[in-house]
Amino acid sequence: MKNVARGLFGLLLGVSALLIAGCGGGDEEGTVEGVDADALLESAATRMDEVEAFHFILTQENGTTDILMGLELVSAEGDIAGADRAQLEVRAKLGSSNIEVGIVILPDGSYITNPLTGRWQEAEVSISSFFNPEIGVTALMRAVTDAKATRRVQVGGADTYLVEAVVDSGNLDLFAAGAAPGRELLARAWIGVDEPFVYRVEIEGAVIEGEAANTVRRLELSRFDEPVEISTPR
């Protein structure tokens, strides 16, 4: 993702615990025979650094994350295209209310829908205030320790290796701006067998001070380098 919004995003991800169907090729210690997890993670980081466009779904379970304008992120879905283009739909909480807002970021400006009227308005919005899949995924692949490939599973129709590892909470700006260091968290990454795209990342545990220990965040990526049009909203 070397040209995709470098410095544009800053991220957090969330989600429910996942039941995984299908596994194969593991030994008695729960690792996939013949797979070097560290080498696989480096291959994934290198490949993702080259991705120019992708679709993402970001979710969080057992809590929300502060993003911007008083909003608490519940989930987000959208597309990144090129160095400075993004569009997403955000489900969030504003006080006690559940709301949905749209965000569009373009080279010449950014826009957000008014939560009350639904109308688009110009705004100084940087995805770096809450979401960085572009830089964060690559950095995370290189920050984890004690990695092992535990299973071979299907994710969205793709054959992947599930890699489990440990990561310091301070390395998780991918999921939350201001991530506090000092906690060892369980990280999972689903990496393609045929080509090392990262299809899913999941983090268990508190990333920010005061979060619940059972917080789960998940980022799902797809449609790598597929054409997507992002234009000024009307």
Go through each PLM region and give its residues.
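Subset-of-secretome marker
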Residues: C23-R234
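Sec-dependent bacterial lipoprotein signal peptides
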Residues: M1-A21
